[in-house]
Curated annotation (Swiss-Prot):
It holds the Pfam family HigB_toxin. Toxic component of a type II toxin-antitoxin (TA) system. A probable translation-dependent mRNA interferase. Probably counteracted by antitoxin HigA. The gene is higB. It comes from the Bacteria. It is an enzyme of class 3 (hydrolase). GO terms for cellular component: toxin-antitoxin complex. Its EC number is 3.1.-.-. It comes from Escherichia coli O6:H1 (strain CFT073 / ATCC 700928 / UPEC). InterPro entries: Toxin_HigB. Probably forms a complex with the antitoxin HigA which inhibits the mRNA interferase activity. This is mRNA interferase HigB. Coiled coil: none annotated. Keywords: Endonuclease, Hydrolase, Nuclease, RNA-binding, Toxin-antitoxin system. GO terms for molecular function: endonuclease activity; RNA binding.
């Protein structure tokens, strides 16, 4: 898939060095694999889940469930755009924000 920017992965790896290896691994697998459907992506990432407050946004757990990647994924055009990489406390705040501020 085409990852729009590597910068969020690099920034998060600096911020959370204990999870840097997991972030780089996630980046590499997504970049090297063309997933056609969410179901196909779940074979590599069983924790992939819909982010129910935005269309085509998905959540991936990273680093033994320490971090969450929220991304817009277009499976037809093979595009992966990171919206947020954050810890669980921030994820809860973002979920609350998006729940209260519909598109």
């Amino acid at each position: 898939m085409h990852i729009i920017s590597k910068a969020p992965f690099e920034e998060c790896a600096r911020k959370y060095p204990n999870d840097a290896l997991a972030l780089h691994s996630l980046y590499r697998v997504i970049k090297e694999t063309d997933f056609s459907t969410p179901e196909e992506m779940r074979t590599a990432f069983p924790n992939l889940d819909n982010f129910k407050y935005r269309n085509k946004w998905y959540v991936l757990d990273v680093g033994g469930n320490n971090l969450r990647v929220i991304a817009y994924i277009n499976f037809v055009n093979k595009r992966f755009f990171v919206k947020h990489i954050t810890n669980h406390a921030e994820y809860d705040k973002l979920t609350r924000y998006y729940r209260e501020n519909k598109e």
